Amino acid sequence: MNKDNVKLAIAPIGWTNDDMPDLGKENTFQQCVSEMALAGFTGSEVGSKYPRDPAVLKPMLDIRGIQICNAWFSTFFADGLKEKTIDEFINHMNFLHAMGAKVIGCSEQSKSIQGTTKGVFEEKPYFSDEEWQRVADGYNELADIAKGKGMQVCLHHHMGTGIQTTAEIDRYMSMVNDDVYLLFDTGHAYYSEGSQQAMMAILEKYLPRINHVHLKDVRDEVVAEVKANKLSFLDGVKKGTFTVPGDGVIDFRPVFKLLDERGYKGWMVVEAEQDPALANPFEYAVKARRYIKETAGI
C-alpha cells in the first residue's frame, strides 16, 4: 500500500473496554498510549480514560507521536432524540476538531442491544420506515454541520444495532446524501454476514464513500458458540469473538489490495476488543503491526 495515503492507528479498546470497564481496568491511559507508540502506530481513537481537554491530551500524545483520528459518537435519531443528539454532536465535533481529526465516526444506537444481555443474532433491532427516515435526515444534518469545520461524518455499521447487515447498510447508504460516509469495519461485516466474500462485497460496493476503516479479525469458532448458545455481543467479546488482523479467519490481503488499487486515503485502525487478561494488549498490538507490515507493506 501507499504509505503516503494511509496512516495506521490502533484503538484503546484493546487495553480497556469502554462497554465493560472491568476488562482492562488496571491499564492506565499513559501505559496505553505509550504501548501504542512502542508497537509502531501513529494514531489512536479516544477511550474512556483519555483526558477530554485538548490542552491536556494533545501534549501527552504529541510527545509519543500519536494523533487522534476519530472518536465514537452515539446517535439516537430513530428514537426521536434529534435535538439532544445534535447538541451533543457539536460538542464532540469541536473536541475532535481541536485534536486535529477530520472524521467523526458515529453509530445509530436507537434500540441497540450491543451493551445488553440479549442474543446478538436473535434479538437485533429493526427500524420502521419512519425510523429509517429519521436516521437519514439526522445524518444528513450532521454532515452539513461537520462540513462547517472541514470534517466528515461516517456511520459505523455494528453488531446488535439497526444498521448491521448488508441489506441495512444498503438501505442507509441509499437514503443519505453523498457527503455522508461509511466507516467500514472488517470484523463487524464478517461477523454479521458470515463470509469473506460478503465482507469484501460491502467494501467493494461502497469504497468511494468509505472514509475510515477498522481492522479487526474474527474467530469463527467463537461466532459458532455465540450462535449455538444465543449469546450477547459482550459475551462474545469476552470469549474472543474478535482479535487483531492475522490472528483469525479473515484474509486481509485482498482488503489491503482493494483499498490500495482504489486509492483509499485515510486511517486504518486496528480495533479489536478482547479480554486484555487473556490477550496482552501490547503483545497483540505488536502482532497486528507486524502482520500489516508483512501483508500491506506499510
Swiss-Prot record:
Keywords attached to this entry: Cobalt, Lyase, Manganese
Uppermost EC category: lyase
Cofactor: glutathione; Co(2+); Mn(2+)
Alphabetized GO MF terms: manganese ion binding; myo-inosose-2 dehydratase activity
Organism for this UniProt entry: Serratia proteamaculans (strain 568)
Assigned EC number: 4.2.1.44
Keyword Ion transport (UniProt): no
InterPro entries registered for this protein in UniProt: IolE, IolE/MocC, IolE/XylAMocC-like, Xyl_isomerase-like_sf, Xyl_isomerase-like_TIM-brl
GO BP terms: inositol catabolic process
Reactions catalysed: scyllo-inosose = 3D-3,5/4-trihydroxycyclohexane-1,2-dione + H2O
Family membership noted in the UniProt record: Belongs to the IolE/MocC family.
Protein name: Inosose dehydratase
